């Protein structure tokens, strides 16, 4: 097999822009957070590089999420509740929304992603008055449980009863989703579900990023 130090610049010679998709191994937190695969492409390709998904961030998806909220929000600073992801949290903080993260204890995100968000361990309390509910599951971050699943409690599933606590909130998920584990059929198939337009906005977010990168080549 060709070494990355040769393979990456060879790939760079074939194109103008490179999109890289890589994943966390959940064996070594420091290694995952260094984003070694993505960083090697940035360092050695000689081309503009964008992340299609990486160990700690999924920027095109979270950009699409932001576009979706901007399209559907009815107030300047909506309440957005992320319930039991790093990039989504970054964008919500950057947008200065009323952002709440709710999850079981032990699933705290890395501090740089929490930002100014309010962390609420009581999911029902967090959902009160929400305008958008973004469901996502993730593994533990803190040592010694990094990468582990600590809670399999179905009580965290987003269902109609919990959505009734909100201010007629829209439901969001990046897809694919495990139905009736993350969210019930009733919620994801409801008129307030934005999962399809949210997915469609992935095309828009990618187009915006690629356009900016290609303009920079001129």
Specify the residue positions occupied by each region the protein language model found.
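Phosphate/diphosphate ligand-binding glycine-rich loop within oxidoreductases
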Residues: 1-70, 179
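General beta-strand structural signal in soluble alpha/beta enzymes
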Residues: 19-20, 49-53, 58, 82, ...
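Hydrophobic/aromatic ligand-binding patch that stacks against planar heteroaromatic rings
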Residues: 10, 41, 91, 162, ...
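Rossmann-like adenosine-cofactor binding region
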Residues: 112-186
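Adenosine-phosphate binding glycine-rich loop
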Residues: 168-170, 174-218
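Glycine-rich phosphate/diphosphate-binding loop of Rossmann-like nucleotide-binding domains
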Residues: 70-135
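A short, gly/pro- and small-residue-rich
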Residues: 30-51, 145-166, 191-192
